[in-house]
């Protein structure tokens, strides 16, 4: 019970911090009493705001969310290997390192110092949004899979399957 009260206090603190960064009224009204799943959903819905304002801060995420968000598509300072499965959206935050096999459509955001090793299979489409000092490594060398990159920062190594590269710097 104490843990839930602690988490709730931190989520209230997070809302106040979001408001101080200019969170829109709609998101403020919809805030409610979110659990981890709802916070992950809110992150993906408000990702542009989160990236623009570096919100929530990585330190807050590390202290309050690390290890609780993987099943909802958010990695925080973690290293894993996985297949896409049902996951359609992923975010790598902090110094995460993900090796993933993608078989369908997937939208992946990589931030901070995270690394994404992408194995793209035939017929799939992957959209990657790169920020900060992130690294994209496309492991696949050939095939009919397509990768579209919006590059706001970071570096690409082994980018042979990139179909479209939008420089946003």
Briefly describe each language-model feature range.
Residues 1-112, 117, 121, 125-169:
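Short, glycine-biased loop/turn motifs at secondary-structure junctions and
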């Amino acid at each position: 019970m104490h843990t839930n009260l602690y988490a709730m206090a931190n989520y209230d603190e997070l809302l106040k911090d979001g408001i101080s960064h200019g969170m829109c009224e709609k998101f403020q009204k919809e805030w409610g009493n979110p659990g981890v799943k709802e916070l992950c959903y809110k992150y993906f819905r408000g990702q542009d705001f989160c990236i623009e304002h570096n919100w929530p801060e990585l330190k807050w995420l590390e202290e309050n969310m690390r290890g609780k968000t993987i099943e909802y598509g958010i990695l925080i300072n973690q290293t894993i290997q996985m297949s896409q499965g049902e996951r359609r959206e992923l975010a790598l935050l902090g110094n995460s390192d993900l090796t993933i096999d993608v078989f369908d459509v997937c939208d992946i955001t990589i931030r901070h110092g995270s690394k994404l090793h992408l194995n793209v299979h035939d017929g799939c489409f992957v959209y990657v949004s790169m920020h900060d000092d992130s690294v994209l490594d496309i492991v696949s060398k050939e095939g009919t899979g397509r990768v579209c990159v919006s590059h706001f920062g970071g570096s690409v190594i082994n980018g042979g399957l990139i179909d479209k590269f939008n420089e946003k710097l």
